[in-house]
Amino acid sequence: HASLTLAALAGIRVATTRPVPLARGTALAIERFDRAPGQRLHALSAHVALRAAGSEPGYPALAQLLRRRGVLAHGQWQQDKHELCRRLVFHILIDNTDDHEKKHVLLVQDNQQLRLSPAFDVLPTGQALGYQSMHVGKEGAVSSVDNALSMAAMYGLSAREALDEARHVARVVDGWPVHFIAQGVSAEATALLADQIDRPFLREQRRSLLAA
């Protein structure tokens, strides 16, 4: 819940969530986004969609799929590509390296065009792997913002626009400890997460973006 609400502050559409206290611990209730009044919406994982398109799993390939089959009305396909770039930067900076293609979902519209669904499974993995679960950029899956922005054009962004998107995400992520505690994460858990999210590899990337 804390990670998703932080992502929302970074300009990422997220599923509506609610923490549910249990006898031991807390569960997270997530409102389904593949439902509408009286109907079930057709949803595809990026894993299925990219395989059907003959593409390797990766953020640039997903952006290209949105360019080809995204919702045209109101330039939605462009907005989805821009948001995908923000999601990638957020995953990197929050140390969510379990961002594989089955955790990205596309909603199939009546005209068979595709819309990026709200994010629904976003949290720090705490593994300090240094690489993402999908292809990121010209350096493969390396968890660096520079790597993510190396393919800015795939998201319909200029180098300057992509940097601005990344800087906004970095400003939000920089306040993650205060936000997490405000959302009910214990001080002890926050301190443990800080060992990964605030380790030099990621902290220096945030600082570099904020100074840009």
Language-model regions, residue ranges each:
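Conserved ATP-binding subdomain of kinase catalytic cores across diverse folds
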Residues: 1-56, 116
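Short, surface-exposed acidic
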Residues: 75-77, 157-166, 187-193
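Regulatory N- and C-terminal appendages and interdomain linkers associated
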Residues: 116, 134, 179-212
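Short acidic alpha-helix initiation/capping motifs at coil-to-helix transition points
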Residues: 140-146, 168-175
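Conserved kinase catalytic-core segment
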Residues: 4-10, 57-128
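C-terminal regulatory or interaction extensions
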Residues: 32, 36, 40-50, 123-129, ...
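Catalytic-core segments of enzymes that bind and process phosphorylated/nucleotide-bearing substrates
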Residues: 47-51, 55-65, 109-162
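Small/polar glycine-rich anion-binding or flexible loop at a beta-alpha turn
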Residues: 23, 84, 164-174, 196
